[in-house]
């Protein structure tokens, strides 16, 4: 039961307010590939937090936007215990809508692995 709580996705690990998003957009490192752009900013010790900015410009259909969000949240949830205290905003590119779930998850897992190794000594 304890392991389930540690791998949950509570409100504390999400960016929820516009001012939190503004801080990340104003001062962040960018990393990206063909499907995603991640904005990463060190935070003040609150642990890793995730924000999603999946626009209609990227994925026209609501079903596609929700599938992208679901994959991002799930991979973040599994990997967040290995990450340093960073705020992350994930944005997508139009190419990602043609990807299947396995391709999306593989791309995101590469980002999470890079973040866990590059953020150990910020």
Model-derived regions: residue spans:
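Positively charged, solvent-exposed patches that mediate nucleic-acid binding
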Residues: 1-122
